[in-house]
Each structure stands twice: as structure tokens, then as C-alpha cells.
Amino acid sequence: MQQNTVTLILVGVIIFLFISLFFYVIYSFVQKKKNRNFKQIKIQPKKNNKITPTSDQKLKADEFISIINKKREILNHQRADYLKIKETQESYQQLQEVISEYQKKLNLEKIKLIDQMEKEIKDNLNEKAVYYMINAMEQHAEDIISSKFSFTIKLENEGMKGKIIGKDGRNKRHFEQTTKTDLIIEPNMPAITISSPNPIRREKAKRTMEKLLETKNMDIAKISLFYKEVEEGFEQTCYEIGKDALENKLHIFDIDKKMYPIVGQLNFRTSYSQNVLLHCVEAAVLAANIAQKLNIDPIKAKKAAFFHDIGKAVDFEIDNDHVNSGVELAKKFNFEDYIINAIESHHNKVSPKTVYAALVKVVDKLSASRPGARFVSNDEYFKRIEELEKICKSFEGVSDAYVIKSGREIEVIIDPSLVSDDECKILIKDIKFKLEDSDLVNKQPIQITLIRKFTQSITTLGSASRLRT
């Protein structure tokens, strides 16, 4: 009985413990669920408070992001370009240094090449050129004839002066009015002078005076009569002179005979005191001889050279220069185009279109540049000297220039601080080419000398400054 009681108590205790454990488990489960619900309740407001963007906002955000990305790309490109530019600038500076160094070497090579080419050209052509020119000029050597604007006629005695002057100067005055020249009679001079810039008038007056002096009697009627006779025969004289020049000297026969008197008038015209007809004949012969050496038509060369100054036969009678007058005459007499081009191009009014026109320019200068062939006035000489010095001084590094020996030599003073020895070799070539391009050295060669020297001076102390203590 007592044992059963104990057993029941134990069973009851076990049941109590089991029930307590059951309730504890249930309580724990409930508490966990409450805690979970509490967390969900606590977290839920955060989820509900989140801002949900609209479609417009998303679109704007995407556009903004796109703009930022584009800006980033632009910045990246600019940065890349900057780096490239920086590298390019550095490379350019290096390139400039290389170019500068190469330019110096190139200048030296240029000097060597120029010297070599000049030597080859001189070796190959100088001998032939000298031969051709000497040969051409040997075949036609004209006497040097220098004319002026006046004729001087010697008188047999002083008594002739009174007859020439006439009563109250009537004879002299009538002679001047008839011939349109100046009659100069100076005391204590056994001669009279006829002066006029018009060569035809001067020649007619000279012939009239010679006829009057032969009669030894002079009056107004005889002056008019003799002048009329001279004037009537003068055209025939010019015709004969022109015929002699064309047919006998140059063997040109296919020219209109009406051109002969005009050609003859060239005999009375001068250019820088050189007889124009003789100049034209000489140029024609030179052109023909050179043309033969060049294997071109010597007849065409001869014609083009002879007629290049034909305008000087009439230009003193009209208000025109001799080139335009020559072209008008050539067209009037139906000259061929190559002759017309030679006339209008020999003073560079137009460019030469044929080899004959170019040849005319050469022989024109050859004839005009013969020693003594032409007289140059002091004003023209000094003007030429000034122009030569001006051209030399136009180059950088040239401090001064002096023309010496009547224009045959030029001394060019170089600043040594601006021009090196090597650069002098290039400078002297540049000066040479520029002078040759001008019209100042076409008549004779000019020797150019560069003078580059370093000068430094110092003054010594006087004896008073050297007293010893």
C-alpha cells in the first residue's frame, strides 16, 4: 500500500513534469512567434517608406547618367589629345633641332654641288662659247663710230663768219628757221657748229651749210634754194644708204623697197652716241653667225636682229617710243611674226616667243657693250653705281658695299657677327644671281668680293697711368 502510494506520487510528479515541459515548449514557441512578428512589424515600415521612382524620373536619371558618361568620354579624349599634342610639341622641337642641323649640312653640300656644277658647266661650255662668240665677232668687226648732237664745220677764214651771220643776223636767223636747227658761232673759233637733237634735221642743215660755204656768197634766197635741193635729194640718199645696208652688207633682198629710205634714216640716228644703222648691221651679222653654230635659220636670225631697232628711224618725229614705232612699221610692211616679236621683246615689253627673239636680245647687248661703242653720261653712270650698291646692301649681314674700278668690281663688307665663313659662300652666290637678274650687269661682267674680318681695338694706358708705387 505504501509502495503504491509512492509509485502514484512518482507517476504524478512525472506527469507534472511532462505537463510543465509541454507548456514550456508551447510557451517558448509562442514567444518566438511573437518575436518574429514583432521584427516583421518593426522592419515593415522601412519597406513601406522606400521611394519608388516614376518612369519620367528613371528616364531623366538615365539621360543624366548618359550625359555624365559622354562628358567622361570627352574628357578622356581631350586628355588623350593633350598628351598627343604634348608629345607632338616635344617631337616638333626635336625635329626643328634636327632640321637646323641638317640645314647646315645641306648648305655645305649645296655649296659643293654649286661649285661642282659650275666647274662642269664651265669645262663643257666655256670653250665652245668663247669659240662661237670670237668667231662671230671676227667675221664682222666694225669701226667704232661715235656721233653727237652737233656737227662742227671748219671755216677757211674768220671773214666767213660775217657772211654767215649776215646783216643784223638775218642770214643766221633765216638758216635756223629754215633748217629748224641751232647755228652756233663763237668768237675766236675758226669753226661753226650746227646743233639739233633731230638727226635728220641736223644732217640736212649740215649739207645745206656745206653748199653755202662752197659758193662763198650767202643770202636768204640761196639758203632757201640750197635747203630745198638738199631736202629733195635726201630721200634718195637715204634710199641708197638703206639699199647698201640691206643688199650689199647683209644680202637681204626680199624687203619692200619702200622700206629702204626708212632704213637709211638709221644712219643719221645715234643711241648713246652709237650709230644705230651700224649697230643694227653688226647685230644682224652676229646673229647670223651664232645661228649657224646653233643650227637655226641664219636668214631669219639676221632679219630679226637687223630690224629690232627700226623704230628709231621715225620715233623722233612722233610721240612714241622706238619699240612701239618699230612694231607699227613692221606691221605696216607685213613683216613676219617672229620679227615683230623680236622688236617688241628686245626691251622686255613682252616675252620672247621664238629662239630668234631671244638671240636678238643677246646680240643687241653684245653690239652695244663693245668698248667705246656707246657713251654713257655721268648721271647715268652714277645712277648705275648707286643701284649696284643698293642691291648688295639689301642682303642681311651686309654692312656696306663699294663699287670700284668704274663699276667693274664691287667690294661687299660683311658683318662677321651675322654671317659665318660658310654662309659667305652662299651669300656671294645670292648677290651674284640678284645682280644678274637686274639690267645693271648685262653689258659687262662684275667681280664681287666679300670682305669679312673681325676688328677689335683697345687703347693702351699712358705713361702717367703706369706710375709705380
Curated annotation (Swiss-Prot):
Record gene name: rny
Function in brief: Endoribonuclease that initiates mRNA decay.
Pfam families: HD (PF01966), KH_1 (PF00013)
Topological category with respect to the lipid bilayer: Single-pass membrane protein
Segments forming domain HD: 276-369
Keyword Membrane recorded: yes
Alphabetized PROSITE patterns for the sequence: HD
InterPro entries listed in its UniProt record: HD/PDEase_dom (IPR003607), HD_domain (IPR006674), HDIG_dom (IPR006675), KH_dom (IPR004087), KH_dom_type_1 (IPR004088), KH_dom_type_1_sf (IPR036612), Ribonuclease_Y (IPR017705)
Keyword Cell wall biogenesis/degradation: no
Any single Gene Ontology cellular-component annotation: plasma membrane
UniProt family annotation: Belongs to the RNase Y family.
One function term, GO molecular function aspect: RNA binding
Transmembrane feature ranges: 6-26
GO-annotated biological processes: mRNA catabolic process
Alphabetically ordered keywords of this record: Cell membrane, Endonuclease, Hydrolase, Membrane, Nuclease, RNA-binding, Transmembrane, Transmembrane helix
UniProt superkingdom: Bacteria
Subcellular localization, as worded in the UniProt entry: Cell membrane
Enzyme Commission code: 3.1.-.-
KH domain sequence ranges: 149-209
Name assigned to this protein: Ribonuclease Y
